[in-house]
Amino acid sequence: MISTKKTILSSILCFSIILSVLSNFSPKLLYAEQIDTDSLIMENSNNLQTKNNQYSNNNYNDVKFNIAVAADWGCTEDTKKTAANIQSKNPEIVIAAGDLSYEESADCWIDIISPFKSKLMISMGDHEYQDTEGGASGIMNTYLNPLELPKTYYSFDFNNVHFVAIDPYVDYGHNSDQYQFIEDDLKNATSDSRIDWIFVMEHIPMYTSPTEHPADSTIRDIYHPLFDKYGVDIVFSGDNHNYQRTFPLKYNNDNGNSSNPIISDNNQNDYKENTGVIYLTSGTAGKSHYEIEEQAPFVAKQDDKHFGFLNIDINDKTVKGTFYANERELGYYYVDYKNNIIDHFTISKMNAANNEFEKL
């Protein structure tokens, strides 16, 4: 856990250099506060528009949009293919869940994602701390001061979804400012009648099959109970350069060991509401692949051979997730990125009007 003033300052500096070059972003995005997405998105892009009347009784049930999620990007030819794959699905929000350029400069990555940079939301990865240019003083004068000391954890609403970004590289313990912000924010989202879904983005995986990086038990023990308490639906992560989707999970601290969560629904693809949190690792944006040694019992689907991204289709009561790989590979039932499906799942919530579950 990182809690020193020096490290917090470093985290802010690194995140600021990435976000500052995204010219269509408002500095408000960087503050640890809930963003007024209605105004923010209208400021930044004609492609990302949220109108207050979408929350009205007349229009709320018609909400339908999609988001794209990927982590561990780099500046490779495969990164370019992933960007094209994402662009082909025309998402309204793109979540880059950490580890962006892997270079001293963000320029190469910014160039690759330029077709949808106005739609981008970012969570912090370890390479945003390790790889930057200019030194602390240069970044301070150029980026930090004009942005008035922004923080790197935040939340925002888009239509009927509440998004929360956690920064695992600044203090996130129970007594930290970040934890207090996250808890208050989730509590408010849960009590908001306009919100059907809560998605969290956080780079370090809390659960994983055996692969390059083990699961982080510290952040898991702090935040999974909080996610259970406030009904978080999905957690997006990266760090491991492969794709993994868990079953819906409940926190289980069995004799001080939380590595064996409770599988609350063992269906492979279709889930009902409030059965548990689904943890998704999508470190597949293009940097490299990490081999998965075996499949953990709490993992429903995994893949370590393909680059691509996770697409989430959302209406008022249904989430449909689809992992699209970038291209055909010999021996696999996959085609090109126009309709290449590696994994799919659906979460359906009760329709109070007719007591039935809806599906896309």
Model-derived regions: residue spans:
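Bacterial N-terminal signal peptides that target proteins for export
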Residues: 2-12
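Active-site glycine-centered loops adjacent to acidic/histidine catalytic or metal-binding residues
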Residues: 72, 98-99, 125-126, 203, ...
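Extended active-site neighborhood of metal-dependent phosphoesterases/phosphodiesterases
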Residues: 87, 105-194, 198, 213-223, ...
